[in-house]
Amino acid sequence: MIRRLAAALAALAILWAAPAAASCSAANTYNFSFSNQAAASLNYANTYTYAATTSGGATQNFTTSFATNGLSSTNVGGTNVPAITTTLTTSTGGKTLMIGGTFSGRTTSISGTTRVIATTFTFGVKIRDLAITIHDIDFTSNQYRDWVMVTGSDGTNTYTPTMVTPFGTNNTTGGTAGNSALTLGPTGSPYNLTNQQAVGTDASDTGSNFGDISISFAQPVTSVTIRYGNYPLLNGEKTTGQQAYGISAIAFCPMPAIAMTKSSAPAATTGTGRFDAPGSDEIYTITVTNNGGSPVDASTIVLTDTLPSQASFFNGAFSPATTPFLLNAGSSGVTLAAANASYSNNGTTYTYTPSAGYDPNVKAVKFSPQGTMAANSSFTIQYRAQIK
């Protein structure tokens, strides 16, 4: 009897057990700068949409929204905030998104909602390698002590960023370095800060980098929130005044976009074997494509494929390879050695050692390609089986 064995789709698992580590190329990185935007007076009640672009012209929209509580004034230095303005600039003189005002009193909890300004950037889809630069986190006695807290979210989990000043301090060890106008958490008295927070401890004039923080996330996120307040009164302080900080630049990478197909074809091109007759061989081809502009982290792709019940796996050299499978890596950068394949005789555990030649006891195969799969690339894996 002549019969066709359908190519059942293989199962594909992308393992994200660790934070994303394979950065995308500069050409695939999305960049946005408020310095390139027209000066504008904004409103805390509104949501604004901006477009980040790659050097190749691809665009990715994101939104900026605000939640405020306890502001008695939204004027800082003669500028109504929020605003895209040169009132508060970067060290190179560029415009920033200036956020602030005057609170009715000091902030008691930066993670709460009282006397806090929360600025949220929402990207709509998961992105990776997000980096944001903020400016002018500082302190003036009896007026303000800037207090910020930064968190990221993927919609389910909350993440802590890496926070670094130009002077070497970070939120792993915390503390203050010379010239820096701020202290990063984690710290204890007198500033009780977590590693998501920073406070101003000295003056930083607009246009300097003394109050700068570079913020980045290892984990993929869909949104980031920067919370801003005025740290509780210390050292005899009695009053509260106007304050502001700036946001200048945002950069991020797209996620990988993995797709997979499986096909089958007779190994023979002539004779009865080309009709998938019993005793003839079938070649199965699994194609994996990364259509995204970001690479797939090394050794995180796992493919499992169940053989049809009428097929016997061929455990012999698949020419020109010396293994029972053939990898065509293309430009993907992945490799696949004999040790990266395993076999199952029950479809559940992959500890079975196949017999030489055609082995009907092989019920499923597992392939674990090694290396980082490049952006915008594909590879194929082929193996063969005999029709019973």
Regions found by a protein language model. Give the residues of each.
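Low-complexity, serine/threonine/proline/glycine-rich extracellular segments that form mucin-like
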Residues: 111, 116-117, 121-154, 159-163, ...
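Exported/extracytosolic protein signature
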Residues: 255-388
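Sec-dependent, cleavable N-terminal signal peptides
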Residues: 1-23
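Extracellular beta-rich ligand/substrate-recognition surface
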Residues: 98-115, 199-208, 372-373
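Terminal, low-complexity interaction segments
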Residues: 24, 30-34, 157-256
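N-terminal targeting leaders for non-cytosolic proteins
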Residues: 23-112, 151, 155-194
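Short, flexible beta-strand-to-coil junctions
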Residues: 102-104, 135-141, 229-232
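Extracellular beta-strand-rich recognition modules
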Residues: 130-134, 223-229, 379-381
